[in-house]
Amino acid sequence: MSSNVPPTFTELLSRCTRSAIHLEMRDSYAVDYEHGPFAEWRAGARLDPDDRASWWRPWLDLIQETVGRGVVVRRARIVSEPVSEYTKFLYDGTFTNVAAGEQVRWLPRRRASDIALPGNDFWLFDKQTIHWNHFTGDGASAGGEVSNEPASAKLCAEAFEEAWSRAVPHDEYEIH
């Protein structure tokens, strides 16, 4: 059953003690906070891995603190190939997630055809609490939803682990 007054995402991550897994299944997102960086990237701007001060942000502090507490943070991205322009943008910036301690893998969608996947992207905390990420057809955020439904948590955990086992680590994945 979903909560009427869900905790914030930061609270969920802060309460997490063992694992935080994130499955992304869209080829494009239109979330507000990425409009500027995506436009700059499309114009040719790239982050300089050696200039940490230019790209470090509060999100990365949160991930670094979480990993520092012993929580394993993993993200799997299921992507169509050839990848979308937006996926190229994500790929180019993923080194920041890795620098914060997040493990990231990429799964070509063709290799995910026989995986039973939930209908929405999600975060799953300690194999129990789900934060569903809802999006509009155009990729804008339509809000989140928190659930502790055991069957849904099991589906998410199993889908993620199967995707993770087939996915390519970020440092080995080549954009196609």
Give the label of every model feature segment.
Residues 1-176:
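PLD/PLD-like phosphodiesterase catalytic module centered on the HKD motif
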